[in-house]
């Protein structure tokens, strides 16, 4: 995540629409409490203007909300929701570290790991659960790699 700029989501004519925090409110999205680490690592480390987050799980507190594999115990819809919850957790950690999501310029990279069974090939549809949330909050022009 890149930090240190007050960039805002812009309309087609270049006028500001909303900051990330305003977009969350407009969308009716309440971030969860930041998850508790499962180990002795830091969930957020900032160096210069870059903020690195540990891999986020689809948890509430220390409770896993989605357990299983795509194509076995979980379907695409459940996995899509799991990716969204993990992204919400990441935003909660970023807000806790920075004080406001408005400090983020953009999300540079998004990694989504999906446990699957058999020859399932729908991982991109699962990752869209996180990507769609980030696009809603930061705008299409700020999609991560």
Place the predicted regions along the sequence by residue.
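Short, polar/acidic, helix-capping and beta-turn segments at strand->helix junctions
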Residues: 2-145
């Amino acid at each position: 995540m890149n930090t240190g700029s007050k960039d805002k989501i812009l309309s087609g004519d270049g006028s500001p629409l909303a900051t990330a925090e305003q977009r969350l409110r407009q969308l009716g999205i309440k971030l969860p409490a930041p998850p508790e680490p499962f180990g002795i690592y830091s969930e957020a480390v900032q160096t210069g203007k870059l903020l690195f987050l540990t891999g986020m799980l689809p948890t509430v507190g220390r409770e896993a909300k989605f357990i299983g594999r795509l194509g076995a115990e979980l379907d695409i819809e459940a996995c899509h929701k799991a990716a969204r919850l993990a992204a919400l957790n990441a935003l909660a950690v970023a807000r806790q570290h920075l004080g406001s999501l408005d400090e983020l310029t953009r999300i540079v990279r998004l990694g989504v790991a999906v446990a699957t069974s058999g020859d399932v090939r729908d991982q991109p549809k699962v990752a869209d659960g996180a990507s769609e949330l980030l696009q809603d909050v930061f705008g299409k022009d700020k999609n991560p790699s």
